[in-house]
Design a protein with these regions (language model features):
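Gly/Gly-Pro- and Ser/Thr-rich, intrinsically disordered tail segments characteristic of DNA damage-repair
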Residues: 1-285, 289-292, 443, 449-507
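Short, charged/polar surface micro-motifs in flexible loops or helix N-caps
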Residues: 12-14, 38-40, 352-356, 426-429
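DNA-contacting surface of Y-family translesion DNA polymerases
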Residues: 8, 229, 235-416, 436
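C-terminal hydrophobic structural anchor segments
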Residues: 404, 408-465, 470-473
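A glycine-rich phosphate-binding loop feature that marks nucleotide/adenosyl-phosphate handling sites
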Residues: 184-187, 282-283, 341-353, 415-427, ...
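Short aromatic/hydrophobic contact patches that present stacked aromatics
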Residues: 145, 387, 420
Length: 507
């Protein structure tokens, strides 16, 4: 088997860098956060600039965390200011470094997702000048994975040379710098980029390039903490592993070597994670058999379509029901647009912390309590599934099903903050027709009354389908808000506002 070489390239603080360039600022020096300040300070920041990260602010902080961290940094800074007083403020890290009498200020840039997508498309066209599309996997809006094997041999260059060539071309074209990881498999390339590159000194353009092979990975990464820094290891995995005394990738690798009679062995991991333990063990050793060709060829056996939203403020039962119906309606249109159908709806309702912080509400609640990622106590979320009698993309049928499901699983007395709605068991319309063609009929379904009822139902579905397709045509031509339903204009409805967003952020 041919040894392969992969590159992982991540555009540095992409959203923040785009906003800096739009203001004719060097992306490395301004103190800037991309966030919708028109919402509450609980809003999630889409990105923070490298200079702002230097104050201990993570990339996906909430706006109030930025405010708090900057306030703390200014208190420390004031102790060293001449006369213990600030003479002004600046959002430039260069000015702040040269003048201790300035307070830390910061710019807030509202998100512009459509604009960022245009920039991402431009940058992808730069990649295509160096690499064929078959050798690129777009991992996210600001990250790609590249199989560089054939290019290194053909052009007689190193992987670092190719990575630098691509990154400098992006820098010249857009002004945005990047970080790269190099490895013999996709996993090691990504870990080199995500973790190891952070310890590499940047060059004069702010570029960091790091390289890992299996042995170097084991030497450098086996003791690295936290585990959540590693690809595909989330808080849940970390918590389970730490509960049995495994804190590092080295611990996981050693665990996998244990004999059946040992306290720790691979069965310990399989008991915790099922078949996913195999991937975890492979990654602990720095192995990854999947190639970009495999990714390109992959077709999922089953699929789902869904959406979620965080409400801008806590919603009561009645207003939440309206939003759930809006989500079901939008889900139906998404299915129609993709020529898909479903026969299963899955709904998750996440409750607000006010249910436990408000004394009156807290006394009235006697259910299970969970702790969220911020360490706050909240009522346990509600979760349920509704199976439909047949495959459908009907807005009427999906709204009726999700309304019934919501009323069945949601606590009428609790305030809601998060909603997730998913259509499961999704098939193409043609595949569903074939499956339903062999549906077993019973004696009652053959009666004249039953057949007439079914024929009338089919007519209604055909009429509704024509309305849905007409709505989609209008939305495509004139915008998502060009045609709305009455419920979208009711108090508390969110669809109209969400139509102007991409990924929950302003377009």
């Amino acid at each position: 088997m041919t040894e392969r070489t992969y590159l992982a390239i991540d555009l540095k603080s992409f959203y923040a860098s785009v906003e800096c360039m739009e203001r004719s600022l060097d992306p490395m020096t301004p103190i800037l956060v991309v966030a919708d300040a028109s919402r509450t300070e609980k809003t999630i920041c889409l990105a923070v600039s490298p200079s702002l990260k230097a104050y201990g602010i993570p990339g996906r902080a909430r706006l109030f965390e930025v405010v708090q961290k900057v306030k703390e940094a200014n208190l420390k800074r004031q102790r060293n200011a001449p006369g213990y007083r600030f003479t002004g403020a600046s959002s430039s890290s260069v000015e702040l470094e040269n003048n201790p009498g300035l307070a830390i200020g910061y710019l807030i840039a509202p998100p512009r997702m459509a604009h960022y997508m245009e920039h991402s498309t431009r940058i992808y066209s730069v990649y295509l000048k160096h690499v064929a599309p078959d050798d690129i996997h777009v991992y996210s809006i600001d990250e790609v994975l590249i199989d560089a094997t054939s290019y290194l041999k053909r052009e007689n260059i190193t992987a670092k040379d190719l990575a630098m060539r691509i990154i400098l071309d992006v820098l010249r074209t857009t002004g945005i710098t990047a970080t790269a990881g190099i490895g013999p498999n996709l996993y090691l390339a990504k870990i080199a980029m995500d973790i190891y590159a952070k310890h590499v000194q940047p060059d004069e353009n702010g570029v960091r390039i790091a390289e890992l092979d299996e042995m170097k990975y084991r030497q450098l990464m086996w003791t690295h903490r936290p585990l959540t820094d590693f690809w595909r290891v989330g808080k849940g995995y970390e918590k389970k592993l730490e509960s049995i005394g495994l804190y590092t990738m080295g611990d996981i690798a050693r665990c996998s070597l244990g004999a059946p009679t040992d306290l720790y062995n691979e069965d310990t991991l399989y008991d915790l994670f099922g078949v996913n333990a195999e991937l975890l063990i492979d990654h602990a050793w720095g192995w990854e058999p999947c190639t970009i060709a495999d990714i390109k060829a992959y077709k999922p056996e089953a699929s789902s379509v869904g959406s979620g939203q965080v409400l801008e403020c806590p919603y009561d039962f009645v207003r939440t029901r309206l939003v759930v119906r809006e989500m079901a309606d939008q889900l139906a249109l998404s299915l129609v647009e993709s020529r898909l159908v479903t026969r299963q709806i899955v709904l998750t309702v996440g409750y607000d912390i006010e249910n436990l912080t408000d004394k009156t509400r807290s006394k009235a609640y006697h259910g299970e309590v969970k702790v969220d990622r911020y360490g706050r106590k909240i009522p346990k979320h509600a979760h349920g599934t509704a199976n439909l009698p047949r495959y459908t993309s009907s807005s009427v049928q999906l709204m009726d099903a999700v309304t019934e499901l919501f009323e069945r699983i949601a606590d009428k007395n609790l305030l809601v903050r998060r909603l997730n709605l998913t259509a499961g068991n999704v098939l193409t319309e043609s595949a569903a027709q074939k499956e339903e063609a062999v549906e077993q009929l019973d004696l009652f379904s053959l009666s004249p009354t039953s057949q007439e009822k079914r024929a009338e139902e089919e007519k209604k579905l055909v009429r509704e389908r024509k309305r849905q397709e007409a709505m989609l045509a209008i939305k495509r031509k004139y915008g998502k808000n060009a045609i709305l339903k009455g419920m979208n204009l009711q108090e508390g409805a969110t669809a109209k506002d969400r139509n102007g967003k991409i990924g929950g952020h302003k377009a």
